[in-house]
UniProtKB/Swiss-Prot annotation:
<protein>
    <recommendedName>
        <fullName>Large ribosomal subunit protein bL27</fullName>
    </recommendedName>
</protein>
<keyword id="KW-0689">Ribosomal protein</keyword>
<feature type="region of interest" description="Disordered">
    <location>
        <begin position="1"/>
        <end position="21"/>
    </location>
</feature>
<dbReference type="GO" id="GO:0003735">
    <property type="term" value="F:structural constituent of ribosome"/>
</dbReference>
<dbReference type="InterPro" id="IPR018261">
    <property type="entry name" value="Ribosomal_bL27_CS"/>
</dbReference>
<dbReference type="InterPro" id="IPR001684">
    <property type="entry name" value="Ribosomal_bL27"/>
</dbReference>
<keyword id="KW-0687">Ribonucleoprotein</keyword>
<dbReference type="Pfam" id="PF01016">
    <property type="entry name" value="Ribosomal_L27"/>
</dbReference>
<comment type="similarity">
    <text>Belongs to the bacterial ribosomal protein bL27 family.</text>
</comment>
<dbReference type="GO" id="GO:0022625">
    <property type="term" value="C:cytosolic large ribosomal subunit"/>
</dbReference>
<dbReference type="GO" id="GO:0006412">
    <property type="term" value="P:translation"/>
</dbReference>
């Protein structure tokens, strides 16, 4: 019985692909209606004026304009779109 014991493969050597979250359009950038501004998990940033929020909390532009990041209150942030004049 001069056999080697079978070499077991490791079970924990896996990782999932990144979800590509984060800010897609930054403050001062021009966006068109429908452009995604932020992809996020939960409401890290809340929608302001002229901005919509998808079912997965994605924030997107409702009008063409300039992106502006603002404070909603002491701890919450919001993003708004103002028409380019």
């Amino acid at each position: 019985m001069a056999h080697k014991k079978g070499q077991g493969s490791t079970q924990n050597n896996r990782d999932s692909a990144g979800r590509r979250l984060g800010v897609k359009k930054f403050g001062g950038e021009f966006v068109r209606a429908g452009n995604i501004i932020i992809r996020q998990r939960g409401t890290k940033v809340h929608p302001g004026s002229n901005v919509g929020m998808g079912t997965d909390h994605t924030i997107f532009a409702l009008i063409d304009g300039i992106v502006k990041f603002e404070r909603k209150d002491k701890e919450r942030k919001k993003v708004s779109i103002y028409p380019a004049s």
